[in-house]
Amino acid sequence: MAIHLLGIRHHGPGSCRNVLEYLQELQPDLILLEGPAEAETLLPCVLNEQMEPPVALLAYQPDQPQNAVFYPFAEFSPEWQTIVYALRNEVPLRFFDLPLVHSMAQNQKPHNTTEEQQEEIIPTVYRDPFDYLAEAAGYADGESWWETTIEHRKDSADVFQAVKEAVTALREELPEHTSPRDQLREAWMRKMIRTAQKENFERIAVVCGAWHVPALENMPKVKEDNELLKGLPKIKIECTWIPWTYDRLAFRSGYGAGIESPGWYHYLWHHPQDDGTLWISQAASLFRKKNMDISVAHVIETVRLAQVTAALR
């Protein structure tokens, strides 16, 4: 029995291709995917011809519908392609994150936290932990570092091992970046992995956010996780699919796992081998629709300049 941990970015064409290549080679007999267990019954809808991403899973509390969460998916989201792979190949797939009946109840009142302790919680300025890797490698921020080293990577060999080692180092140096909520989620994920191990699956693929991988590889004692999960609050929730947009998928919308340019990632997913010519041609077409004089010569020179600048970088 083997557990294969695939640490991903939630929306990225490179991560997406890496996951698909790994799954096709591994041929798993079970896939555990980061997501809410309550939504598993909605997964067959993914193959419906009218289901066109971007879409989102909406989970809400029926008696308080303002208490809701969204799980967006784009065509280039590793989770989306993992679901498609599982359905088309008839591989069992389970969402193994902390159930929403607990996590949404926890959002209303922190688990194992008194009213006095809640008042003492002071908001802090969040810094992407990958910013530290970016700084060491000479990049402006974690976003640009991840895009260059992972999303634009042509060779997927050992990429998941490299990501795991990088995140392990970050978590060791930055323990404060793992929140109590993440600790609860990871305890539940480990519980679901242990359950799957007892069912005699031979090749289990675990697809989750890269930050969680070290916590799922180095498991504490069962007793420790059970103690952490003891007495979780619970509410009733319902789930459904809703349409989504690339604007809402962008980081600027306030979405925590958002990306800078969803349209660019959509392009990379569909045209991974393009040298920039098609992208610039599409941009030129948009300019022409605005009655701007853009010639073929402009396109050629722009592509040439972009390629030379990229080579210098």
Regions found by a protein language model. Name each.
Residues M1-R313:
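Compositional signal for N-terminal targeting/processing segments
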